[in-house]
Structures are given as C-alpha cells and as structure tokens.
Amino acid sequence: DAMHWQLAEEASSYIGEAKNRYVRPIITREYDHSWNMFDMHLYPGGAWRLHMLRQLVGDDKFWAGVQEYVNTYAARTVKSLDFQRCIENHSGLNLDSFFDMWFRSKGYPILKSSFEYDKKKGLGKFTFEQTQVDTEKGIELFEMGLEIGWQDARGADHVDTVHLTKGTQIVNIKMDEPAHVMLDPNMKSLFEAEFNPGDDKLRHLLEHGKTVRGLMQAMSELAKTGKRKNLKAIR
C-alpha cells in the first residue's frame, strides 16, 4: 500500500505540472537551460514510465537490464537508447514503440470511461474515450494495456486486461453482475480518468475495496457528484 500511495503522489505531481504549466517529452533536446530538465516530468513522470516498463518486461529481466546498463556505462557518457538496448537484450522485446510513445512523445492518456451491465448476456460493457489528443501541442493517442478490477456478489475479486488502441473503444467483458468495478487496481498504468460506474458501486468500492487505487477512485468520483449521501460516505 505504501508503494501505491507513493505512486499516486508521483502521478499527481507529474500530471499537475503537465496540466497547469507545460507538457514535454521525457526525452528531449529542446530546452532553454539544462536546469529546466530537472522538473516533475523528469523525476515523477520518468519514474512512472520506468515502473510501467518494469511491469512490461518483468522484474528479473528489468533489473538484469539495469545491471548491464550500470556495469557497461559507468563513468561514461550515455544516451537513453543505450538503456533501452540493455533492457531489450534481457527481455527479448523490441521496445521502440514503448519508448517512442512514453518517453519521446508528449502527454499521457486521459480517459473518459463508462460502464453498463447487460444482465441477459452477462456482459459488462466498458466505453473508453481518449480525450488528451491535442494537435497544437503535439499530443497523440496512446496504446496501452489497462487492467479492470471487479468484485462479484460473493466478494471474490477478478481482474481482466483490455488493450486500448483507438480514440474511442468499446470493450465487453463476460462477468457476473459486479458489486463494484474499478480501473487499474494494481496501479500499473499512468493515466487520468473519469469513471463513474454508478454511485452504489462507488460506495461499495469505498467500503469493500482492497486497493489504494480503488479507494482513491471511489472517493474522487463520489466527491464529484456533490450528493449528500455520497459525501457522507467519504467522511
């Protein structure tokens, strides 16, 4: 839980700077002064992307790549591509698209999300719209895996993974009617989202959720409603 709270704080610091001051790629050669690089993009923003990279390749391969990078380039001038190649050597993956999207491009995913449940078909329908696209700022669509967590009426927790590749995407997941649903229960992805699957489900998540991400999502969305019952649940 402590790590997840830290990740939430780091995401907030980075997103706050990107929304309220400026947005830039993590890796860039455009700056007025080198000190300008030591900002919320570089540290919390960069840390979050390394966290996602570790999730992608796995702990053992990630740290083996880091060790090769340190041992090979200690006391030498390096480029970000050197680090990328070390991780690729141990993961066996081509990471060009990941680094291009998350390190060499601007912004982060901003999702407008909704949920409906079809009792007859036993399907949960999730709609995701990426709203961060801004051609003037050079912010484009992202491709990302996103975990969806849900709890059934018996109290059992489930996690499904969806892959977002389009501006607007509908995903159907076979499930029993959930007591609550949430996005990214294990704090694996960097994004900002609006997601209210229903006030009753949010209150259930607030009371019975088991993750930091779930608690934060429930509190945030309930507060947005301004309803007395929901505000009382938060207190």
Predicted regions and their residues:
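Beta-strand-rich binding/interaction modules
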Residues: 95-96, 106-184
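Amphipathic alpha-helical scaffolding segments comprising HEAT/armadillo-like alpha-solenoid repeats
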Residues: 96, 195-206, 227-234
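Extracellular/luminal regions of secreted and cell-surface proteins that mediate adhesion/ECM remodeling
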Residues: 113-115, 191, 203-204, 216
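Short acidic/polar inter-strand loop motif in beta-rich domains
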Residues: 185-195
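Structural detector for internal amphipathic alpha-helices that build alpha-solenoid repeat scaffolds
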Residues: 189-191, 213-227, 235
